[in-house]
């Protein structure tokens, strides 16, 4: 097949789920609501964790970072998808595609690592409460956050540079919601089998190892919770952990389907649907899952909203 020059002037056409659906208007309205929900809920959660002194704890610092990652992740993808649908213009420049891929990989990989650190935080809090402030000191917590961002950025840079240097064929139509590695490999006019093996190894390392750590952490947590004499303490621990497990299941399930399962196991249409879960649905639901099931967060949100409502009334 004829090759295309990979220059900044060359572009791709993103054929996302909005362009490949029988009811695009309904999907557009749903995505708009979910995006506004993600902006509002993650923004409020970040605000509450930042200004409420009672939430200046390792658990809530990690939760704030999760909200920040979700906010950035969905903003990398959703606004462009919605704007393209309205304009009936689905093109993305070569440079724009590379940037979107880098940012999406960074946010996704950082969240992947952060969720494992959050599981460790819950393990320490429940299984070793007397050592909590030593094992999860502010310094340790910030090291976890920095590790998530730095490792994710390095992985994203490497994969983005390699993928975007592949020779692409004349067909530039990406049947996907965003510029991502699997759909772009389908456009490459080169043998990508070795690179697909590298992606598989990276996927196993960055997805299955954190999942294993999370499962191990919560297995130990479960044994500890079952031995708790207080029903109230047992209930509080289970509520906190179940919230995290719901988030973990949604995120890792979709990411594993996309990056670990062989491409022969899923079609472009299935990939399109799955990408919606980790770019739009999960960022909108994560803060609700955490805040609605956490009394401390709900109290902090009410205090923050109350302050701003009073401030707004006093300025009128």
From Swiss-Prot:
InterPro entries with a match to the protein in the record: GPCR_Rhodpsn, GPCR_Rhodpsn_7TM, Olfact_rcpt
TM spans (from-to): 31-51, 57-77, 98-118, 140-160, 206-226, 245-265, 272-292
Single GO biological process annotation from the record: detection of chemical stimulus involved in sensory perception of smell
Cellular-component GO terms for this entry: plasma membrane
Compartments, as annotated in UniProt: Cell membrane
This protein's encoding gene: OR2AG2
A Pfam family this chain is assigned to: 7tm_4
Name of this protein: Olfactory receptor 2AG2
């Amino acid at each position: 097949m004829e090759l295309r020059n990979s220059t900044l002037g060359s572009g791709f056409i993103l054929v996302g789920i909005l362009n490949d659906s029988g009811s695009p208007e309904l999907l557009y309205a749903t995505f708009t609501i979910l995006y506004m929900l993600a902006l509002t809920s993650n923004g409020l959660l970040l605000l509450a964790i930042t200004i409420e002194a009672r939430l200046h704890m390792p658990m809530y610092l990690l939760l704030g970072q999760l909200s920040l990652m979700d906010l950035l992740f969905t903003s990398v993808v959703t606004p462009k998808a919605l704007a393209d649908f309205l304009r009936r213009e689905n093109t993305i420049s070569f440079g724009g595609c590379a940037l979107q891929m880098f940012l999406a990989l960074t946010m996704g990989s950082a969240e992947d690592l952060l969720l494992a650190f959050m599981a460790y935080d819950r393990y320490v809090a429940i299984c070793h409460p007397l050592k909590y402030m030593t094992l999860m000191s502010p310094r340790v917590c910030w090291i976890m956050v920095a590790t998530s961002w730095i490792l994710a950025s390095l992985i994203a840079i490497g994969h983005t540079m390699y993928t975007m240097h592949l020779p692409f064929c004349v067909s530039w139509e990406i049947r996907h919601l965003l510029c991502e590695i699997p759909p772009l490999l389908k456009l490459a006019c080169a043998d990508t089998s070795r690179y697909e093996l590298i992606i598989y190894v990276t996927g196993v390392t960055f997805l299955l190892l954190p999942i294993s750590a999370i499962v191990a952490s919560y297995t130990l947590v479960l044994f500890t919770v079952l031995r708790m004499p207080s029903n109230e303490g047992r209930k509080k621990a289970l509520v906190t952990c179940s919230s995290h497990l719901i988030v973990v299941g949604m995120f890792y399930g979709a990411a594993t389907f996309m990056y670990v399962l062989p491409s022969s196991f899923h079609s472009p249409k299935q990939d399109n649907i799955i990408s919606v879960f980790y770019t739009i649905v999960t960022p909108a639901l994560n803060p609700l899952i955490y805040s609605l099931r956490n009394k401390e967060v709900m109290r902090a949100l009410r205090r923050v909203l109350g302050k701003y409502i009073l401030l707004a009334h006093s300025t009128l």
